[in-house]
Amino acid sequence: MSRPLLFSALAGALALLSACATTQPSADQIADACDLLTDNHDWYKALRHSSKEWGAPMGLQLAIVNQESSFDGHARPARGPRKFFGLVQGDRPSTAYGYAQALETTWEQYKKSTGNRGADRHSFRDSVDFIGWYVNNTGLQAGVGQYDYKAHYLAYHEGAGGYVQGTWRRKTWLVQRANHVAGQAARYESQIKHCKALRPKFLGIF
């Protein structure tokens, strides 16, 4: 391959990698769902699709992603202390990964249940569809109302069985976190509702 063609190929590859990369949103964007979803319109479409499919409010989905991963599609739980005189990395406390911090076993259940066999935990679209599916299931099993954001997050963390049994009652830190998620979900829902940039355009023109 000649040098000009090689440089051209390299430039094309770099451009493709750049286009595929997802930049983690800034703190200002995370604070405002309107700005966040206007700048990431594919995320808005994914949230809307999941909401229509499963009934999970978009604000709740977004608040769970923020709490679980801070919008980092490759997030994992922090490792424990290093072992063997610091020569070996510590273990992670769970298999949680991706935007939704879904566990491997629960993710496999989601793929089998929905038929979405190619779903990836680092995909925002797949992650919010997972959240919608999970919220719908735990809502039905635990009798949680659609807009009871606090209860939904507690069930997301503890599972439907744990929520019904009240395992969360002994975890003050979790109740505080659920209150925070509920407040953010309500703010996100309001911001999305009043965001002019996200409203359908007439004939795609106005």
Q: Where in the sequence are the language-model features?
A:
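Bacterial N-terminal signal peptides that target proteins for export
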Residues: 1-9
